[in-house]
Amino acid sequence: MKQFLDFLPLVVFFAFYKLYDIYAATSALIVATAIVLIYSWVRYRKVEKMALITFVLVAVFGGLTIFFHNDEFIKWKVTVIYGLFAGALLISQWVMKKPLIQRMLGKELTLPQPVWSKLNLAWAVFFILCGLANIYIAFWLPQNIWVNFKVFGLTALTLIFTLLSGVYIYRHLPQEDKS
């Protein structure tokens, strides 16, 4: 159910874009993201930090898009979010000395420290590359291509990278954890 809720604003954005335009889609994205956040609070009595940050960025960049009637703001939101993700991963590794990936998954998985570090860096690089790809596609290609990339391309890339990360993790699990 939670995964469905995470994708709901994206589905709403895409549907409103196809039915109306980027501004209606942006308005719908803000509303859908707020509804998911409220539902999460009512249902689970907690809101994940990343969900809250995402909502704030959606509201700010989406609000600017609607107010100025300029789609560049909503296009930048994607890169800003990926930049924040990459920054958090890199800071956790180099400043806090414990990779964020390890903090998130360390209770469920036992991996050698170098594996956590490589996985953390791989995700940081992934987010940086996705952010750069977003900039190129958002500002050099037609809007409809950017919307398709945002909805389908980035989702597919994230799924593929998650699967590859799973394979990498599996290869480094202790024998007793593999069964």
From Swiss-Prot:
DNA repair recorded as keyword: no
Superkingdom of this protein's organism: Bacteria
GO annotation, cellular component aspect: plasma membrane
Membrane-crossing segments per the record: 22-42, 50-70, 76-96, 121-141, 149-169
InterPro entries the UniProt entry points to: YciB
Subcellular location, record wording: Cell inner membrane
Sorted UniProt keywords: Cell inner membrane, Cell membrane, Membrane, Transmembrane, Transmembrane helix
Topology class, membrane: Multi-pass membrane protein
Principal place of residence: membrane
Entry's family note: Belongs to the YciB family.
Role summary: Plays a role in cell envelope biogenesis, maintenance of cell envelope integrity and membrane homeostasis.
NCBIfam families, A to Z: ispZ, PRK00259.1-2, PRK00259.1-3, PRK00259.1-4
Full protein name: Inner membrane-spanning protein YciB
Source organism of the structure: Citrobacter koseri (strain ATCC BAA-895 / CDC 4225-83 / SGSC4696)
Lineage per the UniProt record: Bacteria, Pseudomonadati, Pseudomonadota, Gammaproteobacteria, Enterobacterales
Gene name, Swiss-Prot/TrEMBL: yciB
